[in-house]
């Protein structure tokens, strides 16, 4: 009777998972032509159903059969039974690269199919022994085994033996019914194999390096290798430690020989070697050693200790958590561990430890290219690094006092945290499952091509999303994605099911981080789940302290108060406080932030719906926490107007209001409070407070830029002053009993107000001018103008309301404080024509129309100001010297007592005054000829000076940078402290500097970095000022910039000096009297 002929139907092939049916039939026909029995072909078809990529597995299997027949090897010996066939086919279905290796290396086929020596069951010692024997070294030598083969032969044997064991591990992994359950075992076996390979490479290095017998050498594994959770293909993080093997070895020789040994072992592992056909194993990364890649390759133990005592950054102690001796001298390795463990377990007490580690994690996330953010299994949000980070932070915070937590492996540590009561059992199980699932995905992606990767398959347009927003998924496209299909089959899932599971896992990991680290910080009555753990008092204090709270006991009391009771506010707080605590911890002053959060709830929690809004708007809640923990001024402001919180949820609400919108509001107030100065003043000042608050919130939230915030605040001042002047004019028309105003009155903005550079703590510098109406006499016009100004000042800064004053500073008027508050146009014309000094001409560069009679302002600016500020003749040398002397005197007189020159943002070396006086001097020199220079703003004028080649691009950059940074620092200082009188002074303490630095884009607790950067910019600016303003040469400017402050400025002052723009008019009057 004829035996049955193997001829699979299309349905048979489809059931086996094959997709290219024509190619599959052709390959089976080829096997039959090669005399492969039908029974074996049927077994092969059955085995393909278990392969992740049946088509590639079949293709590689046929190629292997052809290669073995060409070399006349017995296929039945290599693949003796159906189990061996299944193991081989499964490996070919998960690793195309291994399949291609097997064509030329039959020993790999045997290792994967039968593994006669059961290498997949080897323990650490057995793997070490196998690889040491491969290089001809004695495995019984514990500290210094030496290879006996030459370099090429030993490296070939080492790499070949490594890959044989790797093939057996892949087979063990691939055939597992549940790859997630076996993942920890696989990672440990891969780590043991890497340890053994390093031991073998070190033995080769000893053989190749003269004098190696005098050097004790140990290899410290870091990262995944140190934690025994290595991937299939990964950089191996290593640190090398050396010590002399005998007393006769000097330090220089020790380091020289040790460096040669380290270089050679790295070459064996990662480089091409003449005469070695086997490919390298993996790359070695020495970036975690002291000083990173710039540091010495090898160091003695004491050098390591000195570095960690004096120079190491916080993240380096976190990295040391996973350190483990993996090869070399075991006693020296243990000595390294004994030396570093105290550093690791005291790290959480280091300043800003958790914050710095969090920022490092955030920085890694931010560096991921946008198209890859949702494909990053390892580094992305909700990825493996998030799990590891959560576990490590808990270990480092609580392991200081709980020695049971002192482990390096992520899953082992998670189990210890659960047993210790720091993580609930349910949370530990969920996080363990998530971690193992993501790690298996990473492994399978690496196995396929045996290349380093940790990316989820490319889904095209569906690659973006999965966390905050849904993916744009087409199921048909997913099913056609071969890479996704192969990965999904590893878990027994359909492609769309794998995508859903991946996204669900990432979301759960992010949620668990909050639940595990922050929710236990809430009291027992605030827990949301039955099995939620409750920290002991000591553990809670450690947890609060670790995220930056300076007074953890007070923080605990605040949280208890916020979550107590059955009210709506308490219920919402129980939901959102874990996230709130995390966000507050990212600020410079978490204690202030939590206190402000509690004040908001006490003031408005029962009446306002703001907490419900924050629960529903994550972005608004996060912005609010950033503001409360970084701004005393805005925290106080929000406690007066809680409705402002709603702006944080919509960027449109945070945009600065246009002048037209401001005028509509002031017009409404004019109509409503036209007869009541108190109510009108209250409305104007409240409007100013409200709008400055909006601008501050917007600036802190990154919605508007630095320059836009200055212009927006200027618009607020213009609108309010214009409305206030209108109210005063109307009121005095009624008081005088006339139908029309006897005089037109205008407000000329001066100083930074004139330059549209109003900051959060600015006064409004101005000049007030009136001109009699055609039918009015001078006396009546003067009396009317004085009364109007009296009303105007009462509205803005009088004691008519409890709202903060709007300071209208009139000291820049003719004759300063001794001159009349409001002056007639004719008097101004006479004064400026006859008595104006050089500094007054310079001050007029900022003059612009702000409010009131626009025609009067135009006449003043064109007929009086322009000829003085835009002269057609050059400044004389005497005028130049006068300006320079006046600047020096002004800074010396106005600098507050005890403040060093380099720390005053306005008057200090390289501060605002240097930039503004330099720019204004050049305007006085050139604006008569260059109309584009006739602008009021500092940066506008600087741009023109650069464009017209009157100043070099390099100098312009330095001046612009200094002005921008100093202006932002002044604003930041005011918002941080709420103290206007300190806004110009750069504080000495690093903590306050850190509060200001946040506003300039630095992270919290970066005060030292900010100070160094700012002072460097100011020094460069001062150098430019010395050349352009004082006329010094480059050498003279450099010397002056680095010189110490003069003795005069260092002498203690007995009393504060008056402002220079007040002194200058007085000096001018004295000069005139002397002339008369």
UniProtKB/Swiss-Prot annotation:
Residues 524-1076 are annotated as: Adenylyl transferase. Keywords: ATP-binding, Magnesium, Multifunctional enzyme, Nucleotide-binding, Nucleotidyltransferase, Transferase. Residues 1042-1056 have a biased composition (Low complexity). GO terms for molecular function: [glutamate-ammonia-ligase] adenylyltransferase activity; [glutamine synthetase]-adenylyl-L-tyrosine phosphorylase activity; ATP binding; magnesium ion binding. Residues 1-521 are annotated as: Adenylyl removase. It is an enzyme of class 2 (transferase). GO terms for cellular component: cytosol. Its EC number is 2.7.7.89, 2.7.7.42. GO terms for biological process: regulation of glutamine family amino acid metabolic process. InterPro entries: GlnE (IPR023057), GlnE_rpt_dom (IPR005190), NT_sf (IPR043519), PII_UdlTrfase/GS_AdlTrfase (IPR013546). Transmembrane segments: none annotated. Residues 1042-1076 are annotated as: Disordered. Its cofactor is Mg(2+). It catalyses: [glutamine synthetase]-O(4)-(5'-adenylyl)-L-tyrosine + phosphate = [glutamine synthetase]-L-tyrosine + ADP; [glutamine synthetase]-L-tyrosine + ATP = [glutamine synthetase]-O(4)-(5'-adenylyl)-L-tyrosine + diphosphate. NCBIfam families: PRK14109.1. PANTHER family: BIFUNCTIONAL GLUTAMINE SYNTHETASE ADENYLYLTRANSFERASE_ADENYLYL-REMOVING ENZYME, GLUTAMINE SYNTHETASE ADENYLYLTRANSFERASE. Belongs to the GlnE family. Involved in the regulation of glutamine synthetase GlnA, a key enzyme in the process to assimilate ammonia. When cellular nitrogen levels are high, the C-terminal adenylyl transferase (AT) inactivates GlnA by covalent transfer of an adenylyl group from ATP to specific tyrosine residue of GlnA, thus reducing its activity. Conversely, when nitrogen levels are low, the N-terminal adenylyl removase (AR) activates GlnA by removing the adenylyl group by phosphorolysis, increasing its activity. This is Bifunctional glutamine synthetase adenylyltransferase/adenylyl-removing enzyme. It comes from Bifidobacterium longum (strain DJO10A). The gene is glnE.
């Amino acid at each position: 009777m004829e035996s049955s002929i193997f001829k699979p139907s299309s349905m048979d092939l489809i059931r086996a998972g094959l997709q290219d049916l024509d190619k599959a039939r052709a390959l089976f026909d080829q096997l039959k032509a090669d005399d492969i029995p039908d029974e074996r072909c049927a077994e092969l078809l059955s085995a393909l159903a278990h392969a992740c990529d049946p088509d590639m597995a079949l293709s590689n299997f046929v190629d292997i059969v052809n290669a073995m027949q060409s070399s006349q090897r017995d296929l039945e010996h290599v693949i003796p039974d159906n189990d061996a066939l299944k193991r081989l086919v499964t490996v070919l279905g998960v690793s195309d690269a291994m399949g291609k290796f097997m064509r030329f290396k039959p020993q790999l086929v045997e290792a994967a199919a039968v593994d006669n020596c059961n290498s997949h069951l080897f323990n650490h010692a057995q793997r070490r022994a196998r690889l040491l024997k491969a290089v001809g070294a004695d495995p019984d030598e514990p500290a210094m085994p030496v290879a006996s083969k030459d370099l090429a032969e030993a490296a070939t044997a080492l790499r070949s033996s490594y890959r044989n064991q790797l093939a057996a591990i892949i087979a063990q992994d691939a055939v597992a019914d549940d790859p997630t359950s076996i993942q920890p075992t696989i990672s440990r076996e891969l780590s043991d194999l890497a340890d053994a390979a390093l031991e073998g490479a070190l033995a080769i290095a000893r053989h190749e390096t003269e004098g190696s017998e005098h050097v004790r050498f140990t290899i410290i594994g870091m990262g995944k290798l140190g934690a025994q959770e290595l991937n299939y293909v990964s950089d191996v993080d290593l640190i090398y430690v050396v010590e002399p093997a005998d007393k006769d070895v000097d330090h220089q020789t020790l380091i020289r020989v040790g460096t040669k040994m380290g270089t050679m072992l790295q070459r064996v592992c990662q480089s091409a070697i003449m005469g070695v056909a086997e490919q390298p194993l993996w790359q070695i990364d020495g970036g975690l050693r002291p000083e990173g890649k710039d540091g010495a390759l090898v160091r003695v133990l004491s050098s390591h200790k000195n570095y960690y005592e004096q120079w190491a950054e916080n993240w380096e102690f976190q990295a040391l958590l996973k350190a483990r001796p993996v090869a070399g001298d075991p006693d020296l390795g243990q000595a390294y561990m004994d030396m570093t463990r105290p550093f690791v377990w005291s790290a959480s007490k280091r300043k800003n430890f958790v914050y710095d580690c969090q920022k490092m994690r955030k920085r890694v996330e931010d560096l991921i290219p946008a198209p890859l953010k949702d494909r990053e299994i390892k580094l992305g949000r909700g990825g493996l690094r998030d799990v590891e980070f959560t576990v490590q932070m808990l270990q480092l915070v609580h392991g200081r006092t709980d020695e049971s937590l002192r482990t390096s492996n992520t899953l082992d540590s998670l189990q210890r945290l659960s047993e210790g009561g720091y993580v609930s059992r349910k949370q530990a199980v969920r996080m363990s499952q998530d971690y193992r699932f993501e790690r298996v995905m990473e492994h399978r992606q690496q196995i396929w091509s045996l290349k380093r990767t940790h990316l989820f398959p490319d889904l095209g347009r569906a690659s973006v999303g999965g966390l905050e927003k849904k993916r744009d998924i087409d199921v048909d496209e997913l099913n056609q994605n071969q890479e996704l299909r192969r990965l999904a089959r590893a878990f027994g899932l359909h492609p769309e099911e794998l995508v859903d599971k991946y996204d669900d896992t990432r979301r759960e990991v992010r949620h668990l981080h909050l639940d595990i680290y922050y929710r236990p910080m809430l009291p027992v009555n605030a827990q949301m789940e039955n099995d939620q753990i409750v920290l002991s008092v000591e553990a809670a204090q450690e947890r609060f302290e670790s995220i930056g709270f300076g007074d953890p006991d007070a923080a605990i009391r605040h949280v208890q108060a916020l979550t107590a009771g059955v009210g709506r506010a308490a219920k919402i707080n129980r939901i959102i406080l874990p996230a709130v605590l995390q966000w507050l911890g990212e600020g410079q002053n978490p204690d202030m932030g939590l206190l402000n959060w509690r004040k908001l709830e006490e003031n408005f929690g029962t009446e306002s719906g703001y907490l419900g809004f924050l629960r529903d708007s994550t972005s608004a809640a996060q912005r609010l926490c950033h503001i409360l923990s970084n701004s005393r001024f805005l925290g106080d402001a929000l406690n007066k107007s809680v409705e402002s919180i709603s702006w944080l949820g919509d960027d449109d609400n945070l945009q600065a209001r246009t002048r037209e919108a401001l005028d509509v509001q002031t017009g409404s107030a004019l109509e409503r409070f036209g007869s009541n100065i108190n109510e009108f003043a209250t409305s104007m000042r409240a409007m100013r407070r409200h709008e400055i608050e909006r601008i501050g919130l917007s600036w802190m939230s990154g919605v508007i830029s630095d320059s836009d915030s200055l212009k927006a605040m200027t618009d607020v001042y213009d609108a309010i002053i214009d409305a206030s002047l209108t109210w005063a004019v109307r009121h005095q028309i009624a008081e005088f009993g006339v139908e029309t105003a006897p005089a037109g009155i205008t407000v000329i903005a001066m100083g930074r107000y004139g330059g549209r550079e109003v900051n959060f703590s600015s006064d409004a510098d101005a000049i007030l001018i009136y001109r009699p109406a055609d039918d009015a006499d001078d006396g009546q016009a003067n009396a009317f103008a004085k009364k109007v100004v009296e009303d105007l000042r009462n509205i803005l800064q009088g004691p008519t309301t409890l709202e903060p004053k709007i300071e209208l500073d009139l000291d820049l008027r003719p004759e300063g404080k001794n001159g009349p508050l409001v002056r007639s146009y004719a008097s101004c014309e006479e004064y400026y024509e006859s008595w104006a000094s050089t500094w007054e001409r310079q001050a007029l560069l900022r003059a612009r129309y702000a409010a009131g009679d626009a025609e009067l302002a135009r006449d003043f600016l064109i007929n009086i100001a322009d000829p003085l500020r835009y002269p057609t003749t050059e400044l004389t040398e005497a005028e130049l010297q006068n300006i320079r002397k006046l600047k020096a005197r002004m800074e010396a007189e106005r600098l507050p007592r005890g403040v060093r020159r380099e720390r005053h943002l306005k008057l200090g070396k390289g501060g605002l005054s240097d930039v503004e006086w330099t720019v204004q001097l050049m305007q006085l020199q050139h604006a008569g000829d260059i109309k584009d220079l006739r602008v009021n703003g500092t940066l506008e004028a600087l741009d023109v000076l650069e464009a017209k080649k009157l100043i070099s691009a390099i100098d312009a950059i330095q001046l612009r940078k200094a002005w921008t940074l100093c202006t932002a620092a002044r604003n930041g200082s005011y918002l941080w402290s709420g103290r206007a009188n300190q806004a110009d002074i750069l504080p000495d303490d690093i903590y306050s500097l850190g509060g200001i630095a946040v506003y300039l884009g630095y992270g919290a607790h970066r005060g030292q970095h900010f100070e160094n950067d700012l002072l460097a910019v100011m020094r460069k600016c001062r150098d430019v000022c010395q050349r352009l303003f004082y006329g010094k040469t480059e050498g003279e400017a450099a010397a002056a910039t680095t010189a110490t402050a003069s003795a005069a400025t260092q002498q203690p002052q007995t009393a504060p000096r008056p402002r220079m723009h007040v002194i200058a008019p007085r000096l001018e009057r004295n000069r005139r009297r002397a002339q008369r």
